[in-house]
Amino acid sequence: MPKEKYEPPDPRRMYTIMSSEEAANGKKSHWAELEISGKVRSLSASLWSLTHLTALHLSDNSLSRIPSDIAKLHNLVYLDLSSNKIRSLPAELGNMVSLRELHLNNNLLRVLPFELGKLFQLQTLGLKGNPLTQDILNLYQEPDGTRRLLNYLLDNLSGTAKRITTEQPPPRSWIMLQEPDRTRPTALFSVMCYNVLCDKYATRQLYGYCPSWALNWDYRKKAIIQEILSCNADIVSLQEVETEQYYSFFLVELKERGYNGFFSPKSRARTMSEQERKHVDGCAIFFKTEKFTLVQKHTVEFNQLAMANSEGSEAMLNRVMTKDNIGVAVLLELRKESIEMPSGKPHLGTEKQLILVANAHMHWDPEYSDVKLVQTMMFLSEVKNIIDKASRNLKSSVLGEFGTIPLVLCADLNSLPDSGVVEYLSTGGVETNHKDFKELRYNESLTNFSCHGKNGTTNGRITHGFKLQSAYESGLMPYTNYTFDFKGIIDYIFYSKPQLNTLGILGPLDHHWLVENNISGCPHPLIPSDHFSLFAQLELLLPFLPQVNGIHLPGRR
């Protein structure tokens, strides 16, 4: 960070005076810079209404103070306050996070507000000619002194981690969507989906707005496990779980609370030494053993599938096969104690009920929309194979009127709701010429992943055969990923209809709280990941028991 190239203002500050003819023709004036000079002692309050300004030149005046209202100029990237008589700076200056240059040379500054450390995009900080304390000067004069000084200020902004824990964000509200069906056998269970931000990705280069102590895994993991445990979900799907942390932290903590789990690291782990392998991240699924028993577990390696199904496609080999993302799936059996019978009906027992829970983390790069879409197709194809194979081993009485095993799919898809990935999942398929394929030649290999099979008729469309619905319908969650330069929905919980329904979901974090606290991105000392967790309560509709003379009887095994 910053990712965009910064172009400083032209020092000549050339201007053009609009002619009367241009004005008569309705030409609009545009000026993004303002210079005020002439030994000015105070500034008009109307200056702070010019929020369109990107550069403000106030050097060589007689200003002794800068009002806090300067923070209203939120588009400023350049601010020159050099050669004035400024003795102190307002803390609100730290909220001007768009600043790339801040010139404070030749003033009377003895100290700097710690809030200045929030200016993580600042590239130039001029402090020469100020009677600053020696510790600040020492940092500033080191190589890469501006960055070191800003990091020091940010890390000390809140004093210690202890002090910040008293200002917790407001609880996220629970949104009820519908009541459970009391007319038939059902089972209620809850699902959490959460990208916990792996330690090796939590760097100051990516998250310069977050203090280094709040990026530290030992600090973040406490809040992460607290969030997981407070939701008390029956099924927990996590992405970006470091291998070592799965075994030494997550599995240990969650087993104590009655969970069992399954984890697989990304494919690169297989080529690494044991020491390196510890730091590879992957996907994990945890489930409460009082509610489910494990029947099968599966790992889906997308690069292996790409290689096996390339069909001569260079794009499949050069773009998909080179990415080491994975997915995992567990086939669970619902314990009979979790089944709720209609009121007044005796609990006569039932055949075993299976459910497949899948979890995946797709490639991150926005330039690789084709890869995300192909990875999603491969994953759903493998999930369908797992379900079909497991269904063949079950009696029809177990599957009931639905004829298949229900699916819960959790994922960080790294794809927005208007993407080909989400269109594919939610509508049942996608056109082979969809724009997200970037006109690359995938057609022959994609037919392998269509529900019609390699020899089936695609009619120009790749389908998956499930009827999937998102637990979080449009508008319920404005974003699941919240960083300074990206805020959007990329995490999802899908489930198969008609066996499953959503009864309720955990709503978003209060946006007003984020704004009022000037939280421009996460992680943050109070928010441990750059993702917000998803949490939904689902209802599983179970098959009716076989009837003899109108009486329900348990199915025979």
UniProtKB/Swiss-Prot annotation:
Molecular function GO terms recorded: 3'-5'-RNA exonuclease activity; metal ion binding; poly(A)-specific ribonuclease activity; RNA binding; RNA exonuclease activity; transcription coactivator activity
Cofactor: Mg(2+)
InterPro entries, per the entry: CCR4/nocturin_mRNA_transcr, Cnot6, Endo/exonu/phosph_ase_sf, Endo/exonuclease/phosphatase, Leu-rich_rpt, Leu-rich_rpt_typical-subtyp, LRR_dom_sf
Binding site for substrate: 240, 276, 361, 366, 414, 481, 486
Pfam families, per the entry: Exo_endo_phos, LRR_8
GO biological process: miRNA-mediated gene silencing by mRNA destabilization; nuclear-transcribed mRNA catabolic process, no-go decay; nuclear-transcribed mRNA poly(A) tail shortening; positive regulation of cell population proliferation; positive regulation of cytoplasmic mRNA processing body assembly; regulation of translation
Free-text cofactor note: Binds 2 magnesium ions, but the ions interact each with only 1 or 2 residues.
SUPFAM superfamilies assigned: DNase I-like, L domain-like
Keyword Lipid metabolism attached: no
Residues holding Mg(2+) 2: 412
Any single GO CC term annotated in Swiss-Prot or TrEMBL for this entry: CCR4-NOT complex
Task of the protein: Poly(A) nuclease with 3'-5' RNase activity. Catalytic component of the CCR4-NOT complex which is one of the major cellular mRNA deadenylases and is linked to various cellular processes including bulk mRNA degradation, miRNA-mediated repression, translational repression during translational initiation and general transcription regulation. Additional complex functions may be a consequence of its influence on mRNA expression. Involved in mRNA decay mediated by the major-protein-coding determinant of instability (mCRD) of the FOS gene in the cytoplasm.
The name this protein goes by in its record: CCR4-NOT transcription complex subunit 6
